[in-house]
Amino acid sequence: MKSDKKNTKNSAFLTASFLLFCSGVAALIYQVIWIKQLGLVVGVDVYAITTGVSGFFAGLAIGSAVFGRLADRSPKPLRIYIGLEIGIALLGITATLMLAWAPAWFVALQSSTGVLAWALPFMLVAIPATLMGGTLPPLLAALKPEDASVGRMTGQLYAANTAGAIVGALIT
């Protein structure tokens, strides 16, 4: 009986690791595409990279904090995870399409609002990245690790996500 429970936990952990690996691949593919598109929006690669990376990491941090709290309180954290992944797909595609149209909007905003125009490309990246940042906490909450193994399990899940991010960056 104890062995069956351990096998179920191992299977759930491997599934969560695989999901986070795939999520990492997709996240970095989006990030690389968005940064390339931002170069066309703002016209200077260094500003595009700065805006893209800043928006991406701000979104990741906000998403982890917000959805971590929600996952801790939720009786069904996997539903949160599924909703986040669906939202990432929808917002990721939307952001990619909007970035294709953003150069004209950015120029018009920059003429009228100056530095505030930078909020447009920043937010186009930060909003979907917020959902990306929220994916690990619900999976961790669903696994319900014992207190003694929370740190180790969190690190292993982040490692799976990071490995996916490396693959995503390499194939883009």
Locations of regions flagged by a protein language model:
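Alpha-helical transmembrane segments of multi-pass membrane proteins
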Residues: 1-172
